[in-house]
Amino acid sequence: MELSLTTSIALATIVLILYKLATRPKSNKKRLPEASRLPIIGHMHHLIGTMPHRGVMELARKHGSLMHLQLGEVSTIVVSSPKWAKEILTTYDITFANRPETLTGEIIAYHNTDIVLAPYGEYWRQLRKLCTLELLSVKKVKSFQSIREEECWNLVKEVKESGSGKPISLSESIFKMIATILSRAAFGKGIKDQREFTEIVKEILRQTGGFDVADIFPSKKFLHHLSGKRARLTSIHKKLDTLINNIVAEHHVSTSSKANETLLDVLLRLKDSAEFPLTADNVKAIILDMFGAGTDTSSATVEWAISELIRCPRAMEKVQAELRQALNGKEQIHEEDIQDLPYLNLVIRETLRLHPPLPLVMPRECREPVNLAGYEIANKTKLIVNVFAINRDPEYWKDAEAFIPERFENNPNNIMGADYEYLPFGAGRRMCPGAALGLANVQLPLANILYHFNWKLPNGASHDQLDMTESFGATVQRKTELILVPSF
């Protein structure tokens, strides 16, 4: 009797599993705690059907805040507590300073030459210096203040023009506003193909979330083609590259004084002067970082802040009262007006605790074998720091799942990675270099949305009916659009 193809594959898989079990070498080495695993896929079956950050958090609560995950071929250690985060990101920071290679980084990020994915070494150190001194300095972030103020005011006018009492998609409005702010900061103006550019960036962000088969089986190159991932990424990259080339070509025609340089001006100046070893592809990779990562993280944070406030009317009333008392009927908000509003800042800090932009941070990779608390960690082992779990650790946070901005009153926790129980932007050498720009793109938009309008759910729904389901991508977004009704 002939066997069907499905039956043949199933039998072959069973034989392979039994062979792997029988021939697996024994080891006397101290092993990190881990869940039960299967041959070939390792621990992936524990994460099926879950948000990765939540699934990993639940495994850590069962097996320990320093545990091992086998993700296909990739050996991974997961850190889920402030204690271990501090140990690894201080004592072993340089050991785990590399980034694992990914198919997305290879194709989309111009062979991993952007700031986020570049391997640790001289090129990355120069990029980091470039960010600190030029691209993302306090002075440079401040120079974009007028852009933020203009685009926030444009959003206010658009909402008012739509009419009081009519539902609008705040998700769409916020994303568009942040994208325009960053587009103007990067290129000096809203680009003519901005809608297409934004859609391509959104697609890239969708492709970079979760655990991808191409990255968990890196040696199985046929899977890159079989899954269709390589073809999809290549197609996206071609469109993206054409658009950025057009932007750069148009930009060469214009001139800017150094005092008013856009991000692209800075990069092209450094490239042309040979001050810094930048190629045309390097410039494009860095610009993509600035626009892509910045748009997604800031817009998600503003959305989550408003979502949490809708579900917590007491906090909403308190933050709006603070804004309206301080601004006293002022029409257009300037950043100086909101620098000393404590409750607004508490709301932002609590939002970042519950909804860190990158809940699993960006994975790192071990550069050399290391002994970690008696455990032998092999070269190229992947490191995941679950900031989502750390920020909700009940040992450090009372009522950890609740939205309570007041918990940060008189709380010295540093938002920039100095306190390891609170790591919204990561910590150590590979901490997010754009934190200051990201915060600026959250604070003013949020203040405008809360100051100018009252908000409620459509169709008479009560505040506790707001769907807070997550959708995992490069960042954790709301699964459903935030549709609210403004009144003014």
Swiss-Prot record:
Residue numbers on the Lumenal membrane side: 24-488
Residues annotated to bind heme: C432
Membrane topology designation: Single-pass type II membrane protein
Keyword Protein biosynthesis: no
GO cellular component: endoplasmic reticulum membrane
Subcellular compartments: Endoplasmic reticulum membrane; Microsome membrane
pH-dependent activity: Optimum pH is 8.0.
CDD domains: CYP71-like (cd11072)
Transmembrane segments: 7-23
Predominant place of localization: endoplasmic reticulum
Residues of this chain annotated as glycosylated in UniProt: N260, N379
Entry function: Involved in the biosynthesis of germacrene-derived sesquiterpene lactones. Catalyzes three consecutive oxidations of germacrene A to produce germacrene A acid. Could also catalyze the three-step oxidation of non-natural substrate amorphadiene to artemisinic acid. Can use beta-elemene as substrate.
Protein family (similarity comment): Belongs to the cytochrome P450 family.
Protein name: Germacrene A hydroxylase
Organism of derivation: Cichorium intybus (Chicory)
